[in-house]
């Protein structure tokens, strides 16, 4: 066991990006208080980190095959220590959420419960687990919006929808990449039932929904936004359509489609941030 293992198991890069996204969402929704952005960053960081810890705890047998280098299967963190660590992080996140407002506190509590149920149960149910992750990713925008006020909820809805559908597509493709390890670990995923090709078709459909939703902010941000998001949308579509060429998880993994899709989603987030900055200063 090691302290470094307890830091690694929260997946700080993943959790940190989620925290930064919450701060950006607050700014896009019209927030102006830097301290609130820091508070949101902390809440999302620790709650997301706790969820990652629980995932590793329940995925121990699968990770022995897929990711033996992770903290629990490698022995850097004990299973019991992981549960305690997750509890501490969840408690810290909920406690910090008490300093926001009733709407944000409600989202934090719902997400904590969902993260626990997801790790223990939903993750093993085909497609339901993917839907849970997609909601949790999109809810970061709702969290940032509600801190500004209930009226900002409507501002965040298109961004929630874009993130929801984009994440859903990526999660399905990730499951398609992990078919062999998931099968050996006893997991049940949608790609195991319908195959890589049909999963890729579903991913393309959900990406198309995300692209359609991405046009809605044009009503607020205008032509410049439309041009920028159009470039990002084209990249995301091309990457996802490329997945249709592959019949096996090995081919899909080698293509790096999920990695490029992640880059495209980051680019979309940058466009949202840029447009809000331009709206404030121009």
UniProtKB/Swiss-Prot annotation:
HAMAP family: DGGGP_synth
Source organism: Methanocorpusculum labreanum (strain ATCC 43576 / DSM 4855 / Z)
Predominant location category: membrane
Function as written in the Swiss-Prot or TrEMBL entry: Prenyltransferase that catalyzes the transfer of the geranylgeranyl moiety of geranylgeranyl diphosphate (GGPP) to the C2 hydroxyl of (S)-3-O-geranylgeranylglyceryl phosphate (GGGP). This reaction is the second ether-bond-formation step in the biosynthesis of archaeal membrane lipids.
Cofactor: Mg(2+)
One biological process term in Gene Ontology: glycerophospholipid biosynthetic process
UniProt-listed Enzyme Commission number(s): 2.5.1.42
Protein name, entry field: Digeranylgeranylglyceryl phosphate synthase
Catalytic activity reported: sn-3-O-(geranylgeranyl)glycerol 1-phosphate + (2E,6E,10E)-geranylgeranyl diphosphate = 2,3-bis-O-(geranylgeranyl)-sn-glycerol 1-phosphate + diphosphate
């Amino acid at each position: 066991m090691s302290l470094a293992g307890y830091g690694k198991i929260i997946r700080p890069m993943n959790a940190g990006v989620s925290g930064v996204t919450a701060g950006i969402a607050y700014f896009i929704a019209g927030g102006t208080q830097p301290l609130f952005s820091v508070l949101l960053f902390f809440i999302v960081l620790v709650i997301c980190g706790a969820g990652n810890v629980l995932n590793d705890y329940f995925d121990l047998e699968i990770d022995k095959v897929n990711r033996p280098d992770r903290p629990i299967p490698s022995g850097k963190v004990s299973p019991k220590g992981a549960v305690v660590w997750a509890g501490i992080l969840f408690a810290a996140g909920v406690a910090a959420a008490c300093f926001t407002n009733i709407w944000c506190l409600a989202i934090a509590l719902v997400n904590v419960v969902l993260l626990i149920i997801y790790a223990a149960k939903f993750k093993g149910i085909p497609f339901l687990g993917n839907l849970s992750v997609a909601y949790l990713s999109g809810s970061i925008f709702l969290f940032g919006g509600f801190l500004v006020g209930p009226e900002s909820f409507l501002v965040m809805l298109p961004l929630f929808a874009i993130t929801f559908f984009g994440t859903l597509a990526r999660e399905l493709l990730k499951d398609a990449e992990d078919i062999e390890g998931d099968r050996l670990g006893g997991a049940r995923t949608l790609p195991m039932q319908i195959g890589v090709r049909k999963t890729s078709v579903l991913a393309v459909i959900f990406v198309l929904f995300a692209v359609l939703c991405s046009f809605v902010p044009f009503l607020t941000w205008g032509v410049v936004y439309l041009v920028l998001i159009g470039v990002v949308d084209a990249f995301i579509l091309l990457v996802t359509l490329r997945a249709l060429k592959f019949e096996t998880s090995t081919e899909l993994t080698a293509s790096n489609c999920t990695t490029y899709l992640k880059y495209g989603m980051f680019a979309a987030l940058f466009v949202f941030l840029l447009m809000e900055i331009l709206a404030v200063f121009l």
